[in-house]
């Protein structure tokens, strides 16, 4: 009984919630290719290399054809080749490739990719809204108006010399669900946020 209780409490302690819904298991040295290189595409490649477990190689493509242009820069397709031996995530924009990457990983994480589905993926997505915002009510002193979960994420006194790893985790979580904009300050923010120093931050 003592051992059981210890194990349960240890498991609870290990989960701090910071991974949010991005609790992917490690991948299996997945084969991921992208002809084009950019910071955004490197993130997509890294996510798949670290977490893709489907066993089928994945190719990332930025293409400028009629079908993809109709989906916009943030829309994408996820398709399995006719032979079933390759998955292609394609978009007319790099952002669309990243969103498609998270879509594929989400299907995997939620158990929606049995072998039969892997062989016949044919997904096409187009955002209904061009701007998808996460809105904050944070003040420059770290307090949050109507905030009930601690202090602000933003460490203004440390920026720009110290960039917290939490900012990357925050951006990753947003990208994984298609959020492409953020309001980082309260609507009644201090006018200091428009000063040169704060614009630099």
Which sequence ranges carry the predicted segments?
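Sec-dependent signal peptide recognition
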Residues: 1-4
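Feature activates predominantly on carbohydrate-active enzymes
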Residues: 39, 44-47, 71-77, 81-201
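Single, functionally critical "micro-switch" positions that shape active/binding sites
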Residues: 13-14, 92
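Residues at alpha-helix termini
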Residues: 54-56, 177
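Acidic helix-start/capping segments at beta-turn-to-alpha-helix junctions
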Residues: 56-68, 120-123
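Short hydrophobic beta-strand segments
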Residues: 16-42, 57-63, 89
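N-terminal signal peptide c-region/cleavage motif recognized by signal peptidases
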Residues: 9-11
